[in-house]
């Protein structure tokens, strides 16, 4: 079709320039929402008396026909983008009246509207997938409230904890992600439609009507801002980066735990791969892929922040670069959440190996220090005493539970027989009953709270 902007020009763009400027290869993803936006715009034009009834009926029928044949459409780079491609297809169906659809509308507010609509659909789908992941985490946690494992700092064994407590830490990370996405929807559910190229329009349009038809909750009060704003995209990319960071941290732990050196978890065959050379291998490839894809999602955020950092108002062609990054991020984070959900749901935690790991370390050292405090010794002094006891064990090739009472009393005479039950890792975990702690009762309370959060939806 003739370029929408062709009247000003005396020669066509070169084929190379045309291909370089075209976005149809990726923005065709917006086809369905573009038609949705056009239907709302056309209905508003009719209700405002800008379109005749017969014109509205023709345009509506044509757009709905395009909706039913969406998968069959053939797009061309000659028509640059999804908007011009769909206008060409509509013109082929209903004739010149299709040109009236663009009354009081620019591609600037049109593409912004499309992006708002598309992102709303995606964010809702991502929220649903995150909730499913959280549900799976609570199911695994429920089975492992009293499964004891080493807790780590600096990847060194620190204190014994409940496996459920560890799993639920990620539940709350994803809960914050869900909160951020829900808040992001407030900015996504704003309508730029009717802002025109930048300055509004002389036609008596009703922007609130078209917003209502599209399910938007607000209308941009400034037309310049409406077509220039991509904050909602940047905000989403930042949230998606945080989701991927949380997934990547969890994946890192799974990769470590699945190694023979730890052997804390067994991933199902459905979420593992082998080696083309080494027949014994069972690799956590999908956890590694999620960890690796996190970097690309970060790159999309930084890339688009850099694109937007020096753009004057209003629209600039640079902003065409918003789509590939956000589409790639959306696909990546959604797939990652869904793959990770299946991986966790089908994983088997090796409870005996986890418990055994707590029996052969010094993660009960804090229990000994706390015991001394209950005997009236200041914590800093108790810390020093226990440090010397640990050093003695390291030099002697034993653990705190192996020391005799007479040996303990060389470090301090207040230590008595009642110390030994406290050194048991299961008892050590059970006793940590403070709110949010790893004690079994506290973890059950936390699990109930997590389930309550999911029931709110």
Swiss-Prot record:
InterPro entries: Arg_succ_lyase_C, Argininosuccinate_lyase, Fumarase/histidase_N, Fumarate_lyase_CS, Fumarate_lyase_fam, Fumarate_lyase_N, L-Aspartase-like. Keywords: Amino-acid biosynthesis, Arginine biosynthesis, Cytoplasm, Lyase. It catalyses: 2-(N(omega)-L-arginino)succinate = fumarate + L-arginine. GO terms for cellular component: cytosol. Pfam families: ASL_C2 (PF14698), Lyase_1 (PF00206). Its main location: cytoplasm. GO terms for biological process: arginine biosynthetic process via ornithine; L-arginine biosynthetic process. GO terms for molecular function: argininosuccinate lyase activity. It comes from the Bacteria. Its EC number is 4.3.2.1. It is found in: Cytoplasm. The keyword Cell inner membrane does not apply. Pathway: Amino-acid biosynthesis; L-arginine biosynthesis; L-arginine from L-ornithine and carbamoyl phosphate: step 3/3. HAMAP family: Arg_succ_lyase (MF_00006). NCBIfam families: argH. PANTHER family: ARGININOSUCCINATE LYASE. Belongs to the lyase 1 family. Argininosuccinate lyase subfamily. This is Argininosuccinate lyase. The gene is argH.
